[in-house]
């Protein structure tokens, strides 16, 4: 059985603050990786939080360990561009996610 997880990631030490996100090292590989997770139904929502160095993601997975393992495969994790601050189970109480039938 799967559940939803809220994930907070932040820019790591390898992030280059002088260039936009789309010009970071291995941007295309990172974007392709995240798009593949979305196509699988694992990464449900994702995006940067305005005015911060953080990114909020909503994942559907079987456990926190599964979320950690999947994010560890991202080249931006491996190369230190992003690091995970926390992963917490999330109970959606209002609205629905597209294509989601619930818990």
Give each language-model segment a name:
Residues 1-103:
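Conserved, structured core segments of small domains
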